[in-house]
Curated annotation (Swiss-Prot):
Main localisation: cytoplasm
Purpose: Participates in chromosomal partition during cell division. May act via the formation of a condensin-like complex containing Smc and ScpB that pull DNA away from mid-cell into both cell halves.
Family according to the record: Belongs to the ScpA family.
Subunit structure: Component of a cohesin-like complex composed of ScpA, ScpB and the Smc homodimer, in which ScpA and ScpB bind to the head domain of Smc. The presence of the three proteins is required for the association of the complex with DNA.
Keyword Cell division: yes
Compartments in which it is found: Cytoplasm
Keywords: Cell cycle, Cell division, Chromosome partition, Cytoplasm
InterPro entries on file: ScpA, ScpA-like_C
Upper classification of the organism: Bacteria, Bacillati, Bacillota, Clostridia, Eubacteriales
NCBIfam families linked to this entry: PRK00104.1-3
Organism: Clostridium botulinum (strain Alaska E43 / Type E3)
Entry's Gene Ontology cellular component terms: cytoplasm
Signal peptide (from-to): none
Gene name per UniProt: scpA
Any Pfam family hit: SMC_ScpA
Protein name: Segregation and condensation protein A
Length: 251
């Protein structure tokens, strides 16, 4: 049996791999062929020799679940309760897959919004009142002097400016690529080089605006993904602590 070509670095977790295999085999997420998916998934596990053990354990847990479901499919059903347990286990796995797919889609949406945020512009000020047009063909400029015409123009210009809906005009300077994830990544790497443990709140305190805070947080997530640091909290809403990984220090 031919297995699809798999690159370890392409996937962020076991459910990301499962979604890839389901799409690769053109399966419906609500009707997955567990036997076929399990074989391909186990081949992927065999290629994880150089992966971090903490990450590998997540894949192994899902692999064990797939093997158990597959074995129950192959074995004869003795009791009705066993059949129901098998269905519940498979249903639970599918529900987790669907939830992960929704979260991944939402994350991609917000990422696109962030990337395109620097390309948004507001429309020009609108005139609140409509100009009343008449069918009067009378030459209103007849017998007007040049000075009177000039004064009339200034009066109309003043009326126009006063009727602009300036309250809804966003006065904002847009900085294109002022804050880059690559730059923040270098800054954070230098920070953890000199400190055993750093507080994320201290990094945020030095940010000039909300956009810089967001870029700093994305850079931190990238460092976690690259296995450069560990992040943890003592409790919910406590300070996020950043610690350099020991294996990275040895390198």
């Amino acid at each position: 049996m031919d297995f699809p070509s798999i690159k370890i670095k392409d996937f962020e977790g076991p459910f990301d791999l499962l979604l890839h295999l389901i799409k690769k085999n053109q399966m419906d997420i609500y009707n997955v062929e567990i036997s076929k998916i399990t074989n391909q998934y186990l081949k992927y596990i065999d290629e994880m020799k150089f992966m971090d053990l903490e990450i590998t354990s997540e894949f192994i847990v899902v692999a064990a679940t797939l093997i158990e479901i597959k074995s129950k499919h192959l074995l004869p059903k003795i009791k009705k309760d066993e059949e129901e347990d098998e269905e519940d286990q498979e249903k639970n796995l599918i529900e987790k897959l669907i939830l992960y797919k929704k979260i991944k889609k939402a994350a991609e949406f917000f990422k696109d919004r962030y990337v395109n945020s620097g390309e948004l512009y507001t429309k020009k000020p609108e005139i609140i009142e409509e100009i009343n047009l008449t069918n009067n063909n009378e030459d209103i400029f007849k017998n007007l002097t040049l000075l009177e015409l000039y004064n009339m123009y200034n009066n109309l210009l003043e009326i126009y400016n006063n009727k602009q809906n300036k309250a809804n005009v966003i006065q904002k300077r847009i900085y294109v690529d002022k804050y880059k994830i690559e730059d923040k990544l270098k800054y954070l790497l230098g920070l953890i080089e000199n400190n055993e443990v750093s507080k994320f709140s201290e990094i945020i305190d030095k940010c000039e605006c909300k956009l810089e805070c967001i870029v700093s947080f994305l850079a931190l997530l990238e460092m976690v993904k690259l296995k450069k640091v560990r992040v943890y909290q003592s409790d919910s809403f406590d300070n996020i602590l950043i610690e350099r990984r020991q294996d990275d220090r040895e390198e």
